């Protein structure tokens, strides 16, 4: 077995968990969660809207409390931990990043689709100019082979990234998928490599462990697994596993368990689990945001939304391509009618309504 080293753990309850909370975190909740994580030895705590700085919008969902207020509360509360923020090119700008720095962030995590690292050059540049630690996120990383991801990660390194993450946004990877991708980045880069898991196939902890076994320097978790889809790797479970492996980076396992049980669990609207919908997202390999749209259109056409999602995954649809859902539904309907001997399917009137 390889010699393992303790990874740095970033808790993203207050960012990825914001999706599950519908972006309704309060200052009081942030204060309580940050205090507990800080006391338990978590070195980095991410705090923003689920879609990053400036994510609060009609498109992504409005925050109940300004993310800048939440960041400020987190920075005031943390005694040792660094506060991090997520930034997506095309959503967050220099203005929001500057404002977040004024409120106390020390780390920015810059996320792009795994095929679009080149759009992050300006963002890494300005973040380094502002004195931040910079982390790159290659989202939907299951969609491209390891060698391609290594090339994209190398671009981020050249722009100034201090670490690049393999991000399993859809929770679609198997442990060997993770190993090969992390290994490719470790071989190519001279900077740190990270891994961010989702639990749609029930593999968040197993995949995180696979990443650590391949040398991942940083990993992510959320208390109680609170996150998008079926959630993330639970921070308290990561701590327990690392402790059993003898590579605990200084986390208090019991305090994290208590934080999950007594602080986060009571405010959760639901417990993220790999239910039918989450499994479908992981199996199909698509963003969880596609789910409601697929359900709506499937109901109009009398289709199973899972058929639509699986086909979207086959076509490698990514966020922003929700308009594909209608086309995919019509294609499936045509194929079914042709198979039934109906010949060319006429587009139902519902198609016109959905396209409006």
Curated annotation (Swiss-Prot):
NCBIfam families on file: 4OH_2_O_val_ald, PRK08195.1
Single GO BP term: L-leucine biosynthetic process
Record InterPro entries: 2-IPM_HCS-like, 4OH_2_O-val_aldolase, Aldolase_TIM, DmpG_comm, DRE_TIM_HOA, PYR_CT
HAMAP family named in the record: HOA
PROSITE patterns (UniProt xref): PYR_CT (PS50991)
Pyruvate carboxyltransferase domain sequence ranges: 7-257
Keyword Disulfide bond attributed: no
Residues given in the record as substrate binding sites: 15-16, 169, 196, 287
Name assigned to this protein: 4-hydroxy-2-oxovalerate aldolase
EC number: 4.1.3.39
PANTHER family xref list: 2-ISOPROPYLMALATE SYNTHASE 1, CHLOROPLASTIC-RELATED (PTHR10277:SF9), HOMOCITRATE SYNTHASE-RELATED (PTHR10277)
Keyword line: Aromatic hydrocarbons catabolism, Lyase, Manganese, Metal-binding
Active site as annotated: 19
Catalysed transformations (reactions): (S)-4-hydroxy-2-oxopentanoate = acetaldehyde + pyruvate
Residue(s) at site: Transition state stabilizer: 15
Gene Ontology molecular function: any one: 4-hydroxy-2-oxovalerate aldolase activity
Binding-site positions, Mn(2+): 16, 196, 198
One Pfam family it belongs to: HMGL-like
Family to which this protein belongs: Belongs to the 4-hydroxy-2-oxovalerate aldolase family.
SUPFAM superfamilies in the record: Aldolase, post-HMGL domain-like
Entry keyword annotation includes Manganese: yes
């Amino acid at each position: 077995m390889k010699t393992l080293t303790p990874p740095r753990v970033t808790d993203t309850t207050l960012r990825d968990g914001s999706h599950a909370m519908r972006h309704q975190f309060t200052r009081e909740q942030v204060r309580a969660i940050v205090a507990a994580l800080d006391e338990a030895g978590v070195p980095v705590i991410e705090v923003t809207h689920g879609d990053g700085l400036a994510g609060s919008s009609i498109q992504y969902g409005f925050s109940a409390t300004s993310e800048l207020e939440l960041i400020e509360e987190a920075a005031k509360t943390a005694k040792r931990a660094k506060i991090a923020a997520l930034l997506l090119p095309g959503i967050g700008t220099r203005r929001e990043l500057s404002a977040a720095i004024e409120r106390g962030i020390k780390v920015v995590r810059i996320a792009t689709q795994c095929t679009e690292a080149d759009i992050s050059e300006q963002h890494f540049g300005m973040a380094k100019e502002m004195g931040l630690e910079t982390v790159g996120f290659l989202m939907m990383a299951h969609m491209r082979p390891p060698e391609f991801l290594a090339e994209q990660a190398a671009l981020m390194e050249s722009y100034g990234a201090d670490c690049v993450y393999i991000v399993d946004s859809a929770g679609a990877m198997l442990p060997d998928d993770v190993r090969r991708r992390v290994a490719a980045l470790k071989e190519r880069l001279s900077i740190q490599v990270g891994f961010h898991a989702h639990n749609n196939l029930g593999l968040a902890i197993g995949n995180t462990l696979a990443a650590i076994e391949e040398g991942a320097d940083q990993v992510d978790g959320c208390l109680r697994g609170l996150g998008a889809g079926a959630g993330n790797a639970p921070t308290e479970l990561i701590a327990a596993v690392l402790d059993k492996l003898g590579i605990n980076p200084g986390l208090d396992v019991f305090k994290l368990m208590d934080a999950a049980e007594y602080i986060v669990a009571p405010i959760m609207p639901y417990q993220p689990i790999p239910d039918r919908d989450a499994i479908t997202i992981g199996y199909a390999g698509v963003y969880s945001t596609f789910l409601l749209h697929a359900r709506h259109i499937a109901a109009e056409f009398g289709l199973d939304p899972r058929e639509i999602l699986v086909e979207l995954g086959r076509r490698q649809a990514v966020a922003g391509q929700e308009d594909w859902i209608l086309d995919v539904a019509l294609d499936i309907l045509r194929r079914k009618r042709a198979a039934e001997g109906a010949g060319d399917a006429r587009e139902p009137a519902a198609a016109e309504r959905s396209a409006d």
